Every structure is written in structure tokens, then in C-alpha cells.
């Protein structure tokens, strides 16, 4: 079973040829949808693969699955 990250955890993920960074704001263990920059983003979250609403340093948001993220540092 996956150990979920907690709100406030700094994380990274691959974005094209780059690495993006952010901080977890909210944790979801059930399917979730959010509209980000006018696009509906969905994640099929579960206790085994939680989803996270992540804030980025420049103020943007991302909705990511646990399997997409790595703890920063």
C-alpha cells in the first residue's frame, strides 16, 4: 500500500523534458476533477494511489496522481 504524502510536502514531477516542482495543498483518496486554466483535469484517486492538488511556485495548480510524483529533496 502507498504511503500518501501530506499537505505541505514539496514534490517534483516530469513535465516534458523538464522537472516541475510544487507543494501539496490537498490530498484526495476518491476520484476527483478540477478545472485548471479552463481545462477539466480528472484523476481516479484511491487510497492505494491518492491524487494531490499541487501549487507551483509561480502560482499555478496541477492535479497529480501519487504515481506521477516524487518527494523533493
Kindly label every feature range from the protein language model:
Residues 19-27:
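Short beta-strand-centered aromatic/proline hotspots
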Residues 27-33:
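Short, conserved beta-turn/loop elements at beta-strand boundaries and strand-helix junctions
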Residues 43-73:
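Intrinsically disordered, low-complexity, charged/polar segments
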Residues 1-4, 16:
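Short, surface-exposed secondary-structure edge patches
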